[in-house]
């Protein structure tokens, strides 16, 4: 533990931190109202996670590419203990996952996806059982890590959305290497509320490979991508949608708006990363609630080694 407390960490969440700090300082009244609205939908655990996330977002300095921060200046003792346990867990299991899922060639493995299953482990048992045999949506499929974990819940099919060409090639390899061609449908699309195009920057360093952002000081590559809505893609679908998983790098609100009909018709479980900007963080839960008032929510940190990453909203009826 002593060694861990003295360690420094580098974090690449510059654009995320800045948007939260700007929102807080530019419009405190709206910030407080949105926070109050969000808390009214949550249990005590989620409220605690929300408050801790925002506390860190608002106090951390904006990083540059080589910015380092002392771990003990960021985390409390409980969090430091969790970080140490997470590091031990990763060291013990990472080779197992590489071998089990034929992941040779992956530069960076998101072990947290394999550990937490995008938050699905926290669902009530009856809700998890009810996922079996339904169609799953994997928005922001990356190289296929979340797709691999979703297969453990016995979907009839997984429909993957991934707009980045490099990521899509790796996703196709993961599907082939794991014998999933008949279980997975892939769309080279980003998700939004309408069919449109966008110019995206994809961070290309090894620590952030594949992350898409509007702006970043980190090395990135630009790519024109096509966006569409879940409702448009599924308009001829006749089978029940059981899950909508989204990690769409800041497009979460528009992706949920573009899934309104799907959510109202099928009431799927929703797992959505919400840490990319204030709009995602504060607005997605109330938006889902407006589609169906029976939705329940958890907000969970699904990355122990840096608490600002992978903050996920889990919603179910």
Predicted regions and their residues:
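Phosphate/nucleotide-binding beta-alpha loop and adjacent structural elements of enzyme active sites
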Residues: 1-317
């Amino acid at each position: 533990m002593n060694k861990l407390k003295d360690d420094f960490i580098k974090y690449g969440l510059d654009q995320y931190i800045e948007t939260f700090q700007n929102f807080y300082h530019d419009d405190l009244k709206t910030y407080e109202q949105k926070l109050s609205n969000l808390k009214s939908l949550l249990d005590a655990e989620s409220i605690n996670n929300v408050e801790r996330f925002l506390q860190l977002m608002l106090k951390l300095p904006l990083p540059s590419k080589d910015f380092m921060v002392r771990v003990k200046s960021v985390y409390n003792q409980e969090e430091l203990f969790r970080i140490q346990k997470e590091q031990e867990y990763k060291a013990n299991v990472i080779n197992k996952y590489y071998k089990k899922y034929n992941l040779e060639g992956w530069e960076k493995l998101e072990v947290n996806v394999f550990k937490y299953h995008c938050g699905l482990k926290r669902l009530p048992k009856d809700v998890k059982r009810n996922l079996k045999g339904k169609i799953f949506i994997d928005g922001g499929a990356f190289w296929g890590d979340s797709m691999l974990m979703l297969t453990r819940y016995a979907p009839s099919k997984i429909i993957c959305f991934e707009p980045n060409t490099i990521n899509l090639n790796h996703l196709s390899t993961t599907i082939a290497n794991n014998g999933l061609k008949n279980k997975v449908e892939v769309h080279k699309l980003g998700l939004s509320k309408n069919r449109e195009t966008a110019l995206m920057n994809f961070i290309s360093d090894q620590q952030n490979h594949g992350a898409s952002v509007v702006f970043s000081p980190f090395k990135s590559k630009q790519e024109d991508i096509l966006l569409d809505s879940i409702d448009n893609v599924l308009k001829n679908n006749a089978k029940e949608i059981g899950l909508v998983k989204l990690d769409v790098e800041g497009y979460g609100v528009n992706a949920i708006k573009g899934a309104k009909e799907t959510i109202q018709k099928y009431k799927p479980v929703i797992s959505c990363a919400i840490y990319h900007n204030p709009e995602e963080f504060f607005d997605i839960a109330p938006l889902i609630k407006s589609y169906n008032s029976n939705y329940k929510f958890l907000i969970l940190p699904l990355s122990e080694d840096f608490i600002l990453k992978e903050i996920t909203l889990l919603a179910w009826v």
